[in-house]
Amino acid sequence: MSNHDQLHRYLFANHAVRGELVSVNETYQQVLANHDYPPAVQKLLGEMLVATSLLTATLKFDGDITVQLQGGDGPLTLAVINGNNRQEMRGVARVKGEISDDSTLQEMVGNGYLVITITPAQGERYQGVVALEGETIAACLENYFMQSEQLPTRLFIRTGHVADKAAAGGMLLQVLPAQERNEDEFDHLAQLTATIKAEELFTLPANEVLYRLYHQEEVTLYEPQNVSFRCTCSRQRCADALVTLADDDVTEMLEQDGNIDMHCEYCGNHYLFDAVDIATLKNGNSASSEQIH
């Protein structure tokens, strides 16, 4: 599509169907950086990243979406992607045990489930739980849309490599709400979209991708939105967490290592706190408490 990760929205003039097209090559590479995930887990995270970007683009408000696989008895105990309406993404996975290169979703997760959490900047949080009945993340999320919004939705996700670097992209088709539905038209557009090749998604401009798929259709392509990796960790957040720990626990950690090393699983950053830092934090927290009371 382009040298930078972007999400494009598009609309069919003669059908009550809208679409999205996204490429997340660079963001995907940053999610995988500093981690030694098995190839099957890398692929799964790429699929989840694409899906989260496409889902986030459906938000009509400022807020966050988290797509999380909670493992059951499989070796993949957790896989999660966080995104927001600004298309800022991050993700991480946890693995305990061996995962072969050709492991399926069910083999990795076991009797787990998919959790979609939508958190508006203002308003109540919504959470949907989907059983892993589909063979892919895309199939599971299509079930989610039918359960939660009753809107026929199809996702087409591709992962792979370009010049030996991880690449991922995808497309979403969805029937417009409050419109008269024509299942045959939607199925026809879905069949066309399913022919998209991975290398086309990874490398071609959006307008060329849409022309190759829908050259007999009238399609409006809207201005793109940039997609990026962004971690929300900070030294202050770590400090806020430390002051909630019991003094004995903090003292024990300091005695063992001489400092407390707080490591962010998402981006790999380390935040070190020594005894002087801890004392300053505790004193500051105590002073704040005195002011409150």
UniProtKB/Swiss-Prot annotation:
Subcellular compartments: Cytoplasm
Post-translational modification: Under oxidizing conditions two disulfide bonds are formed involving the reactive cysteines. Under reducing conditions zinc is bound to the reactive cysteines and the protein is inactive.
Keywords: Chaperone, Cytoplasm, Disulfide bond, Redox-active center, Zinc
Organism: Yersinia pestis
GO biological process terms held by the UniProt record: protein refolding
Source taxon at top rank: Bacteria
InterPro entries with a match to the protein in the record: Heat_shock_Hsp33 (IPR000397), Heat_shock_Hsp33_C (IPR016154), Heat_shock_Hsp33_N (IPR016153), Hsp33_helix_hairpin_bin_dom_sf (IPR023212)
Organismal lineage: Bacteria, Pseudomonadati, Pseudomonadota, Gammaproteobacteria, Enterobacterales
Name of this chain's protein: 33 kDa chaperonin
Pfam short name (any one): HSP33
Name of the gene encoding the protein in the UniProt record: hslO
